[in-house]
């Protein structure tokens, strides 16, 4: 069987090489690049992201990343957002009182977590959606690695989307599966066997 081709979008943010290695370990042929043609034609596109929402959006715009994501989604070609790469898929992010427009694939805002200790950093369980493809075969007590201060804490998008939640004092979205567009707030590339299983499930679905 021919390996599935995956591009990890290089727009100046994210754990690019660790994502590349994690995807290679589950059998994908992976390229880290900002090249539009490569990003458009790959079987799957991974949009990583760490740091500030506004900085990630600025980097994405420099390489026409918004258009790449939008055209892939419109064509039904799979996209996976990770951490801030998930957050920027929403309508906006609010950091330090400043609202930054996101890619707008999902309505709603990404806002700061309300908890005694910020960021939420470490391992946590999730409540995966019934019928989830990403979490297929995983135990209910599987743990995933998070490091973030902001999250989407409500869902205003399609009622058909599969929503996976986690709790850090209050619930927040840990993953979304919405047609060709999927995303995780946790880092699958840092989440050991459980994260590898999520990536493997995603690659298998390409």
UniProtKB/Swiss-Prot annotation:
PROSITE patterns, alphabetized: GATASE_TYPE_1 (PS51273)
Residues passing through the membrane, by range: none
Positions of the Glutamine amidotransferase type-1 domain: 5-206
InterPro entries in the record: Class_I_gatase-like, GATASE, Imidazole-glycPsynth_HisH
One Gene Ontology MF term: lyase activity
Active-site residues (renumbered): 83 (nucleophile), 187, 189
Keyword Transmembrane part of the UniProt annotation: no
GO CC annotation: cytoplasm
Reaction(s) the record says it catalyses: 5-[(5-phospho-1-deoxy-D-ribulos-1-ylimino)methylamino]-1-(5-phospho-beta-D-ribosyl)imidazole-4-carboxamide + L-glutamine = D-erythro-1-(imidazol-4-yl)glycerol 3-phosphate + 5-amino-1-(5-phospho-beta-D-ribosyl)imidazole-4-carboxamide + L-glutamate + H(+); L-glutamine + H2O = L-glutamate + NH4(+)
Biological pathway: Amino-acid biosynthesis; L-histidine biosynthesis; L-histidine from 5-phospho-alpha-D-ribose 1-diphosphate: step 5/9
Induction: Down-regulated in response to the thiol oxidant diamide.
Function: IGPS catalyzes the conversion of PRFAR and glutamine to IGP, AICAR and glutamate. The HisH subunit catalyzes the hydrolysis of glutamine to glutamate and ammonia as part of the synthesis of IGP and AICAR. The resulting ammonia molecule is channeled to the active site of HisF.
Protein name stated in the entry: Imidazole glycerol phosphate synthase subunit HisH
Native organism: Mycobacterium bovis (strain ATCC BAA-935 / AF2122/97)
GN (gene name): hisH
